[in-house]
Regions:
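Sequence/structural signature of outer-membrane beta-barrel proteins
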Residues: 11-17, 65-71, 95-99, 113-120, ...
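Transmembrane beta-strands of outer-membrane beta-barrel proteins
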Residues: 2-6, 28, 39-41, 56-60, ...
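Short loop/turn motifs that connect adjacent beta-strands in outer-membrane beta-barrel proteins
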Residues: 1-3, 17-18, 37-56, 97-106, ...
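Predominantly the C-terminal beta-signal and adjacent terminal strand-loop region
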Residues: 191-251
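Outer-membrane beta-barrel transmembrane domain signature
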Residues: 94, 120-203, 211-216
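Residues that define the transmembrane beta-barrel architecture of outer-membrane proteins
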Residues: 2, 22-28, 54-56, 82-88, ...
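Residues on the lipid-exposed face of transmembrane beta-strands in outer-membrane beta-barrel proteins
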Residues: 8-12, 30-34, 45-50, 88-96, ...
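Extracellular loop and loop/strand-boundary signature of outer-membrane beta-barrel proteins
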Residues: 14-16, 46, 75-79, 115-122, ...
Length: 251
């Protein structure tokens, strides 16, 4: 039903999608899994299931992004810092295919999230729609206990969301960074592969992600310095406690 632990994670991400600079950081991370009738927390994220059927379920989708100082980002030198952001909203999950033993499935994920800055007076910075296909494979052939996740999808943001990252107000324009007003709409594609395994005393997981901004409504922004890039992360978590009750997890 639940597991509790702690660990460490290392990440390598661009400062924002389209940045040509990488932000590498190591963080202590809590490890918590729970599978109740309503609330669930695991390698798929934190979510609450409001509606659940054999093929369709409705849950809560959450996302976080770290802050970025303009002193460290050449493209944004002299511009306001990028605050950490928090996103929350509903997500519909549609199971398109599932193996008889429920160890493999293909789902269509449809999250729509409102985004806010994380500061003393949070700002509404629009919304993000990120439909994607998710293939999960439990117990890889020849690798018992290892789980593989594959995701592929597109990203859309409204005008306020895209402007937060890609607009350049006239007062911040320079000879090499002209003023620019970002529009809402298509914001590129995203592909992710993740692998994980739960050992008796610890959990190990890693992922790699590829983003491509070609064709995005803001691709001509002077703040878009790189239209495609890779990001990656690795996490090791030690399990410190677990419930005596065990439940079957199908998703």
């Amino acid at each position: 039903l639940w597991e509790l632990g702690a660990g460490v994670a290392a990440f390598s991400f661009p400062y924002y999608r389209g940045s040509d600079q990488t932000n590498n950081f190591v963080l202590p991370v809590p490890y918590f899994t729970y599978h109740g009738d309503f609330f669930k927390a695991d390698r798929h994220g934190i979510r609450g299931s409001f509606f659940d059927s054999d093929r369709i379920d409705l849950s809560v989708s959450l996302a976080l992004s770290p802050p970025g100082s303009s002193d460290d980002i050449r493209a944004r030198s002299g511009m306001p810092n990028l605050d950490a952001t928090f996103e929350i909203g509903p997500q519909m999950n549609i199971t398109l295919w599932r193996s008889e033993n429920r160890a493999r499935f293909l789902k269509l994920l449809l999250p729509l999230r409102a985004a806010f800055t994380v500061e003393s007076s949070p700002q509404d910075i629009g919304w993000v729609f990120h439909p994607r296909l998710n293939m999960d494979i439990t117990d890889l052939p020849g690798m018992p206990g290892w789980n593989l996740g594959l995701l592929a999808g597109v990203v859309f943001g409204n005008q306020r969301q895209n402007a937060y990252y890609y607009s350049v107000a006239p007062q911040y324009a320079t000879a090499t960074r002209p003023a620019y007003q970002a529009d809402g709409g298509y914001a590129g594609t995203q592909y992710l592969v993740a692998i994980s395994k739960r050992f008796p005393k610890f959990w190990l997981g890693a992922f790699a992600r590829y983003d491509n901004l070609s064709g995005a409504t803001f691709e001509d922004s002077p703040l878009v310095r790189q239209k495609d890039y890779f990001a990656a992360g690795l996490s090791v978590n030690w399990i410190l406690g677990e419930s005596s009750t065990r439940v079957r997890v199908d998703d």
